[in-house]
Design a protein with these regions (language model features):
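Extended, subdomain-level signal for the structured scaffold at the beginning of enzyme domains
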Residues: 1-126, 139-267
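Glycine- and acidic-residue-rich phosphate-binding/metal-coordinating active-site segment common to enzymes
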Residues: 129-130
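Short, thiol/selenol-centered motifs that function as redox-active sites or metal-ligating centers
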Residues: 133-137
Length: 267
């Protein structure tokens, strides 16, 4: 029987490829994939993430290949993402794995969401695979384990993080969350933030503690991506690692005998 995977995405602006790449990988692998968002509305990509001419101003690199932008627009304009569950409606007992996808909007409507934390804690207790990419990893940081003095569920683990050196941060930043495909009923947020909301690298370093490791390699790239497995977690650094993230989740789910280890709730 095909494994069932729950994919979470933000309604306030995904980085298109960070949803598209794992989504396509999971479906291509033949898994039964269900999408959930905070509002139960189609997840829309940030407009800059589907602009093939966009050059990241921090790393001075064009991060959106034209063929990737075209595929994201195809998914956004079509029906595959049209009718997601809400986070509250989703029940972890119905799935074999939970996969969080990134984007700057995840810092607003995912990272401190009770419903996301409940799904993650239920997956953690059941020793199911938990995936996190880029800024969605903040949701792992803030999911706390009552059995471990309310430390993060990633305490003691090796977890990737979007590097501090890549953050949009500085005196004059005014970041908006303009979406591709926005409608009157699904237009995201008009909030302005002074760059990225939080430095994820710092959050992860604090959350994993001295016995864990924050993997935050500033030279990660499409040809040399950064993804990592430390059961039950599969994590990826940022957009350049989106394809590798999806592929690694498929690899782990297809080879649980190799990767799965006892968790704190089933020892």
């Amino acid at each position: 029987m095909a494994k069932k995977v729950l994919v979470l995405a933000t309604n306030y602006g995904s980085w298109g490829e960070e949803l598209q790449a794992p989504w396509d990988a999971l479906n291509k692998a033949g898994f039964n994939v269900t999408l959930a968002t905070p509002l139960g509305k189609k997840p829309l990509p940030l407009a800059v993430s589907v602009d093939p001419d966009f050059v990241d101003p921090i790393i001075n690199f064009n991060v959106n290949p034209p063929e990737v932008c075209a595929r994201i627009k195809e998914l956004t304009d079509g029906d595959e993402w049209a009718n997601p569950l809400t986070f509250k409606e989703a029940k972890m007992e119905n799935y074999d794995a939970i996969v969080l996808t990134g984007g700057l909007g995840a810092m607003i409507d995912m990272c401190n969401s009770y419903n996301v934390h409940k799904l993650l804690m239920d997956a953690y207790r059941a020793n199911k695979l938990i995936g996190g990419l880029c800024y969605a990893i903040a949701s792992l940081v803030y999911t706390r384990d009552p059995k471990n003095d309310y430390k993060s569920i990633i305490f003691g683990k090796q977890i990737t993080a979007h590097p501090r050196a890549w953050d949009f941060y500085g005196a004059d930043w005014d970041f908006t969350y303009d979406l591709y495909g926005a409608t009157e009923d699904n237009k995201g947020t008009d909030v302005h933030t002074p760059g990225f909301l939080w430095p994820l690298e710092d959050l992860v370093r604090d959350a994993v503690g001295e016995n864990g490791a924050c993997i935050s390699r500033i030279n990660a790239s499409r040809i040399d991506p950064e993804v990592h497995v430390d059961w039950p977690f599969v994590t990826g650094t940022s957009v350049e690692s989106s394809i590798a993230y999806g592929d690694l989740i498929v690899e782990v789910l297809n080879n649980l005998d190799k990767y799965k280890k006892d968790g704190p709730y089933n020892k």
